[in-house]
Amino acid sequence: MNFREKYGQWGIVLGATEGIGKASAFELAKRGMDVILVGRRKEALEELAKAIHEETGKEIRVLPQDLSEYDAAERLIEATKDLDMGVIEYVACLHAMGQYNKVDYAKYEQMYRVNIRTFSKLLHHYIGEFKERDRGAFITIGSLSGWTSLPFCAEYAAEKAYMMTVTEGVAYECANTNVDVMLLSAGSTITPTWLKNKPSDPKAVAAAMYPEDVIKDGFEQLGKKFTYLAGELNREKMKENNAMDRNDLIAKLGKMFDHMA
């Protein structure tokens, strides 16, 4: 599918520097879109922009922005107000692992600003813009962490659950329009962050996917599903989890990350 023809000229990837964000930026360009890269590290973004342009020939812009800043959403909206925006992809997330009370609360406040506040403002703005012109797409990158309580990662799991339920609800509200909204959930994905905190569960390691595969799989579902979990092994794992007693599931997941205690 040519995203430019269906949704508009520009795609923007929030959290584009590496992993799923980087893979998304390449894939949007391959699907015909000019792309705006948003992240904190300007030099890394510029290097990525050059690589995407050289491979695809598309126009790539760099927009350095810390999404935890109070006015981050307003700055991004202002920067894109005169562009034909077609696809918004919110990949960015902050997380902290460890016993809940041992994490500095300032870290949780920073996570909230990235995972909820900036995300919500951008979702609210662009869905309104897209529905007004009856064209566009918003993709939220979710995580298996948001599908259940997760010991030693409790705040992050709760915030990903928020992103999941809001996106799915808005997706249904847009069902009878030409605006496509989807939650694309990734399980274990081989990114720098994942490698730092690799789980001890062999099944989770075996199910790990490369970012490029997550995105190619997920993009094929845009416009077809409200919510999608990439990877057959991840879907099998989720069926197993859903069949468990919730108390047993929480204990099982906690044991996977006991080393974080």
Swiss-Prot record:
Activity versus pH, per record: Shows a maximum of activity at pH 8.5 in the oxidation of ursocholate, and between pH 7.0 and 8.0 when tested in the reduction reaction of 3alpha,12alpha-dihydroxy-7-oxo-5beta-cholanate, with a gradual drop on the alkaline side and a sharp drop on the acidic side.
Domain of life, per lineage: Bacteria
GO annotation terms (biological process): bile acid catabolic process; lipid catabolic process
Protein induction: Induced by bile acids, when grown in the presence of deoxycholate or chenodeoxycholate.
GO molecular function: 7-beta-hydroxysteroid dehydrogenase (NADP+) activity; nucleotide binding
Protein residues bound to NADP(+): 17-21, 40-41, 66-67
Keyword Nucleotide-binding tagged: yes
Thermal dependence of function as given in the entry: Optimum temperature is 40 degrees Celsius. No activity is detected above 60 degrees Celsius.
Site (Transition state stabilizer): 143
Annotated EC: 1.1.1.201
Active site: 156 (proton acceptor)
TM stretches of this protein: none
Family matches, as InterPro entries: NAD(P)-bd_dom_sf, SDR_fam, VLCFA-Steroid_DH
Known catalytic reactions: a 7beta-hydroxysteroid + NADP(+) = a 7-oxosteroid + NADPH + H(+); ursocholate + NADP(+) = 3alpha,12alpha-dihydroxy-7-oxo-5beta-cholanate + NADPH + H(+); 7-oxolithocholate + NADPH + H(+) = ursodeoxycholate + NADP(+); 3alpha,7beta-dihydroxy-12-oxo-5beta-cholan-24-oate + NADP(+) = 7,12-dioxo-lithocholate + NADPH + H(+)
Protein's UniProt keywords contain Ribonucleoprotein: no
Subunit (UniProt): Homodimer.
Function: 7beta-hydroxysteroid dehydrogenase that catalyzes the reduction of the 7-oxo group of 7-oxosteroids, such as 3alpha,12alpha-dihydroxy-7-oxo-5beta-cholanate, 7-oxolithocholate, 7,12-dioxo-lithocholate and dehydrocholate, to the corresponding 7beta-hydroxysteroids. Is also able to catalyze the reverse oxidation reactions.
Family: Belongs to the short-chain dehydrogenases/reductases (SDR) family.
Protein name: 7beta-hydroxysteroid dehydrogenase
Lineage: Bacteria, Bacillati, Bacillota, Clostridia, Eubacteriales
